[in-house]
UniProtKB/Swiss-Prot annotation:
Domain F-box intervals: 48-95
Main location: cytoplasm
Keyword Membrane part of the UniProt annotation: yes
Highest classification ranks of the organism: Eukaryota, Metazoa, Chordata, Craniata, Vertebrata
Effect caused by changing Y279A: Abolishes binding of glycoprotein targets
Record site feature (Important for carbohydrate binding), residues: N159, F177
Protein name (Swiss-Prot/TrEMBL): F-box only protein 2
Organism: Mus musculus (Mouse)
Name of the gene this protein is made from: Fbxo2
Keyword tags: Cytoplasm, Endoplasmic reticulum, Lectin, Membrane, Microsome, Phosphoprotein, Ubl conjugation pathway
Length: 297
């Protein structure tokens, strides 16, 4: 056939080559993604504009519902107004009240740095591991086993007294007829306390320990706590020296608070120990339990 009837002369629409098809699909997908991104940005801008028009007391309540890390790392970068609110005391006082860290109705002027108070309060905990011997000697280092060495015993123990100050304390460490010592070193930065806070605010570091003896033997106790620099230089120290423990079995607390210790503190080294004063084989030396190190708001 010739003319229009010739199959070879009939024109057919061109098909895209395999190489061209993915490019066209990719271009369409990119265009859709761009449209979605622009729509999201527009929604975010509208939301920010809406929040910017809120009265300050209402905006503070909205911001107070957000996680603290988002407030510091993201919200304060939105605009100057938000930065001032995040850096100001009222927002953090409100967060403290909402989370039960301070009573409702606390006055703004009672504390200058509510943001620091908030972060310190959220981190507040005993930084010593295994303070009562529930995990034997786990967490303790530089352990000296004088005489028959340390032993973990159940309260009240032989010729001892119950620990009535805290019902959760069930065990204690008993020392022997020569000095038994053990220590822990706390890395404050690893525990969440940053350099600027430690160097500028210098929050109080509170150390506590409980010790007792037996009713049938005399004993000695000692505690040494040092604040160390990054190079482990001693920047502050508290030491009891050797303390004679009364032979009545009662539990006694010793406490010390480090304040105004200067910049550079990065570690806390806690060391305590005991022995008996009659040199009897066994575990007649001082007993220790419920030791603690706290960074206070």
């Amino acid at each position: 056939m010739d003319g229009d009837g010739d199959p070879e002369s009939v024109s057919h629409p061109e098909e895209a080559s395999p190489e061209e098809q993915p490019e066209e699909a990719g271009a369409e997908a990119s265009a859709e993604e761009e449209q979605l991104r622009e729509a999201e940005e527009e929604e975010e801008a509208e939301a920010v504009e809406y929040l910017a028009e809120l009265p300050e007391p209402l905006l503070l309540r909205v911001l107070a519902e957000l996680p603290a890390t988002e407030l510091v790392q993201a919200c304060r970068l939105v605009c100057l107004r938000w930065k001032e609110l995040v850096d100001g005391a009222p927002l953090w006082l409100l967060k403290c009240q909402q989370e039960g860290l301070v009573p409702e109705g606390s006055a703004d002027e009672e504390r200058d740095h509510w943001q620091q108070f908030y972060f310190l309060s959220k981190r507040r905990r005993n930084l010593l591991r295994n303070p009562c011997g529930e995990e034997d000697l786990e967490g303790w280092s530089d352990v000296e086993h004088g005489g028959d060495g340390w032993r973990v015993e159940e309260l009240p123990g032989d010729n001892g007294v119950e620990f009535t100050q805290d019902d959760s304390v069930k065990k204690y460490f008993a020392s022997s007829f020569e000095w038994c010592r053990k220590a822990q070193v706390i890395d404050l930065q690893a525990e969440g306390y940053w350099e600027e806070l430690l160097d500028t605010t210098q929050p109080a570091i509170v150390v506590k320990d409980w010790y007792s003896g037996r009713t049938d033997a005399g004993s000695l106790y000692e505690l040494t706590v040092r604040l160390l620099s990054e190079n482990e230089d001693v920047l502050a120290e508290f030491a009891t020296g050797q303390v004679a423990v009364p032979e009545d079995g009662s539990w006694m607390e010793i406490s010390h608070t480090f304040i105004d210790y200067g910049p550079g503190v990065r570690f806390v080294r806690f060391e305590h120990g005991g022995q008996d004063s009659v040199y009897w084989k066994g575990w007649f030396g001082a007993r220790v339990t419920n030791s603690s190190v706290w960074v206070e708001p």
